[in-house]
Curated annotation (Swiss-Prot):
Reactions this protein catalyses: tRNA(Cys) + L-cysteine + ATP = L-cysteinyl-tRNA(Cys) + AMP + diphosphate
Signal peptide: none
Disulphide bridges, residue numbers: none
Lineage: Bacteria, Pseudomonadati, Pseudomonadota, Alphaproteobacteria, Magnetococcales
Protein known as: Cysteine--tRNA ligase
Keyword Ligase: yes
EC number(s) given by UniProt: 6.1.1.16
Positions bound to ATP: 281
Motif ('KMSKS' region): 278-282
GO cellular component, one term: cytosol
Short motif ('HIGH' region): ranges: 38-48
Top-level taxon in the UniProt lineage: Bacteria
Positions contributing to Zn(2+) binding: 36, 216, 241, 245
Cofactors: Zn(2+)
Length: 490
């Protein structure tokens, strides 16, 4: 059964300690998790997709294993890039940011990413930011200079604890913009003084706007408290963003800010020479989520992301997306065969048990959960999903009792739901492939298949072959089987 009784206890690779550690929440049974969201000045890209899919699965697993999770994921809706883009387009910041917030939600829905419990916007939390900055100034770890307010990193003894960067070494090798207002080149801004043509808010230090780092500290502590369980994001945020968050929050509260820091690896793009390179607009290898969704179902992108361990670098290429689609096709083929026999597939809502049929490996679900408990090892979990699909195919080929077939199908649905995979109707999966909108409509395909079936019944093999070839030219693949002809798009 997929529930907390089968969990052997979660271990998490904690960036703070640089090792796997048993997960022990601060409050038994309850978990608070904050993940840094997107800066909404453009459409989200495949790197954003990885962060959101990874932490969506982590959230699902925490809930399935019995934890009462509060998941917070923010929007940065005030930032230098946002201001620049709004000015370029001659539109308000609110119009720009809301457009990309809406687009983000559409992209996430296509990827099967469930909404976070709380999705705060930075601009709606200015009072909390100002209060935190004021406390830091009162404690002597922040100072005002030239209309700005800065954090004095030398006054926080544990600066560098997350990234492992020693402050003296950073100063010696730092390539930072010269700012005469700073007491130390590594000091970072908490409040930016007002500039012409930029949004601004009144504050005790004059009109201006918040720095980037203070936003997450203020929102995290508001919704999860001065100390909480998990903080996550991409590896690129370890320094300086998350390092600065720790300095701000602990400098303000005097308490340990976060127990477990989780960071996913980078996304690299495989070039024509087969070499991995950093994804960037300048290299012309930049892919937005919606660009990819025009070519592949969102579930393909999700499977592709989860088929690598979240801490490993993720190599991106279209051939790898094709391999991901082929993997999902294998699972849906097994489910389609079961559906043809049973008439209807059993569903498994999250949280409900998924039973292992008699005679099957009784430890399959336990091993699946062990993989997920072991630092959220989704590639290994997917391997067990394939094992279940293999067992379903075997049960069908050996003409097992329909109850056994139904149980295996239910198990696949249950494991898949845990990962956000294999939840679609298998017929719809195969009929809504790439190019479905531009190609033959389903009704036309069904009509041609009916004509072909009549030709086959009349032993008119030439007509049967002609219809098959016509459909093949439209990217439609036919499979003749015991239960009739099934079709899918290439």
């Amino acid at each position: 059964m997929i529930n907390k009784e089968n969990s052997v206890g979660i271990t998490i690779y904690n960036t703070l300690g640089r090792k796997k550690e048993p997960f022990v929440p601060m409050i038994p049974g309850k978990v608070g998790m904050y993940v840094c969201g997107v800066t909404v000045y453009d459409y989200s890209h495949i790197g954003h997709a990885r962060v959101m899919v990874v932490f969506d699965v982590i959230a699902r697993h925490l809930r399935v294993t019995g934890f009462d999770l509060t998941y917070v994921r923010n929007f940065t809706d005030i930032d230098d890039k946002i201001i620049k883009r709004a000015n370029e387009r001659g539109e308000s910041i609110q119009t720009l940011t809301q457009r990309y917030i809406d687009a983000f939600h559409q992209d996430m829905a296509a990827l099967g990413v469930q909404p976070a419990d709380i999705e705060p916007k930075a601009t709606e939390h200015l009072p909390e930011m100002m209060q935190m900055i004021g406390t830091l100034m009162d404690k002597g770890v922040a100072y005002a200079s030239g209309g700005d307010v800065y954090y004095a990193v030398e006054r926080f003894a544990n600066y560098g604890q997350l990234s492992g960067k020693v402050l003296d070494e950073q100063e010696a090798g730092a390539r930072v913009e010269v700012d005469s207002n700073k007491q130390n080149p590594m000091d970072f801004v908490l409040w930016k003084g007002a500039k012409p043509e930029e949004p601004q808010w009144d504050s005790p230090w004059g009109a201006g706007r918040p720095g980037w780092h203070i936003e997450c500290s203020a929102m995290g502590t508001k919704y999860l408290g001065a100390s909480f369980d998990i903080h996550g994001g991409g590896r690129d945020l370890i320094f300086p963003h998350h390092e600065n968050e720790i300095a701000q929050t602990e400098g303000c509260t005097g308490q340990h800010a976060v127990n477990y820091w989780i960071h996913n690896g980078f996304v690299n793009v495989v070039n024509e020479e087969g070499e991995s390179e950093k994804m960037s607009k300048s290299l012309g290898n930049f892919h937005t989520i919606r660009d990819l969704l025009a070519l592949y179902p969102g579930e393909v992108l999700r499977f592709f992301i989860l088929n690598s361990h979240y801490r490993s670098p993720l190599d991106f290429s279209f051939s790898l997306l094709e391999a991901a689609k082929a993997g999902l096709d294998r699972i849906y083929t097994a489910l389609r065969s079961a559906q043809a026999l049973l008439g209807k597939l059993p569903g498994t809502p999250i949280g409900e048990p998924a039973d292992v049929p008699a005679g099957a490996p009784q430890d399959l679900v336990e091993n699946y959960l062990k993989a997920m408990d072991d630092d959220f090892n989704t590639p290994q979990a997917i391997a067990f999903l394939f094992e279940a699909a293999k067992m379903l195919n075997t049960a069908i080929s050996e003409q097992k009792d329909p109850a056994v077939i139904a149980t295996w199908a239910r198990l696949i649905r249950g494991l898949g739901h845990h990962l956000g995979l294999a939840g679609q109707d298998p017929e719809l999966w195969f009929r809504s492939g790439i190019g479905a909108e531009q190609g033959l409509q389903a009704e036309a395909i069904e009509a041609l298949i009916a004509e072909r079936s009549a030709a086959r019944a009349a032993k008119n093999w030439a007509e049967s072959d002609r219809i098959r070839d016509t459909l093949a030219q439209q990217g439609i693949v036919l499979e003749d089987g015991q239960h009739g002809t099934q079709w899918s798009r290439k």
